[in-house]
Every structure is written in structure tokens, then in C-alpha cells.
Amino acid sequence: MASVSELACIYSALILHDDEVTVPEDKINALIKAAGVNVEPFWPGFFAKALANVNIGSLICNVGAGGPPPPAGAAPPGGPAPPPPAAPAEEKKVEAKKEEFEESDDDMGFGFFD
């Protein structure tokens, strides 16, 4: 996870980008100082240099999930899928549970008008 210093610089860069301002070191420092965050002195310069030639808008729009999609015909990692369980037995159990639930709906414990 990112440190507080890194997050402060990232948020400062995003604020500056949102205001359509370039992201130089002095403006990152000004925002961090205004927020009252203590940051090691190398972080603002590091982020300013890293973001100097980067289109931050496209960077934000192209954030991915972190990995390539699986191949189209690939089998699941656990091997072939097991056959589905017998559906009629499950339906009977569900119906029995529904009946119990419906019976308990009649008496909700509100004896105000009895």
C-alpha cells in the first residue's frame, strides 16, 4: 500500500490536473503544505518528474484490473466443471423452507391489537 507521502503527492497531482494546471514540484509542495501533511522532500520532485511527459487524463481512463484476460478457450483452473446437482431434490428443500417461513410471517410478535 502507498505511504501517506506518496498519497499526498498523488492527490496533489490529481488536484492540479483537475484544475487543468501543469504539475510542477513547487505547486505539489504548495498543496501538500496547505494540507498540513509532512512529506519527505524528495517525493514532490519525484512525482513532478514522473508526470512531466505523461497525459494524466489518459492514465486515469486506462486504469485496468491488473492482469490480462484469460485465453478464449481455456478451461477453468480447477479442471473440468463437476456435473450440476440434482435439481428436484433441492426444489423440495426450498419449498419446505418457504412453508416454514410463511408460517412464521403470520405472527411477527406485534401483539398490540390482540
UniProtKB/Swiss-Prot annotation:
Taken from the UniProt entry, a GO cellular component term is:
cytosolic large ribosomal subunit
Task: Cite the record's Pro residues compositional bias ranges.
Answer: 67-87
Glycyl lysine isopeptide (Lys-Gly) (interchain with G-Cter in ubiquitin) crosslink site(s): 92-93
Task: Give a yes or no for keyword rRNA processing in this entry.
Answer: no
Keyword vocabulary terms for this entry = Acetylation, Isopeptide bond, Ribonucleoprotein, Ribosomal protein, Ubl conjugation
Pfam families, per database record: Ribosomal_60s
Q: Which residues carry this modification: N-acetylalanine?
A: 2
InterPro entries xref list: P1/P2_N_sf, Ribosomal_P1/P2, Ribosomal_P1/P2_euk
Q: Does the keyword Ubl conjugation apply?
A: yes
Q: Which GO terms describe its molecular function?
A: protein kinase activator activity; ribonucleoprotein complex binding; structural constituent of ribosome
Q: How is it modified after translation?
A: Ubiquitinated at Lys-92 and Lys-93 by RNF14 and RNF25 in response to ribosome collisions (ribosome stalling).
Which family is it part of?
Belongs to the eukaryotic ribosomal protein P1/P2 family.
Assembly behavior:
Heterodimer with RPLP2 at the lateral ribosomal stalk of the large ribosomal subunit.
Its annotated function is as follows: Plays an important role in the elongation step of protein synthesis.
What name has this protein been given in UniProt? Large ribosomal subunit protein P1
Name the gene: RPLP1
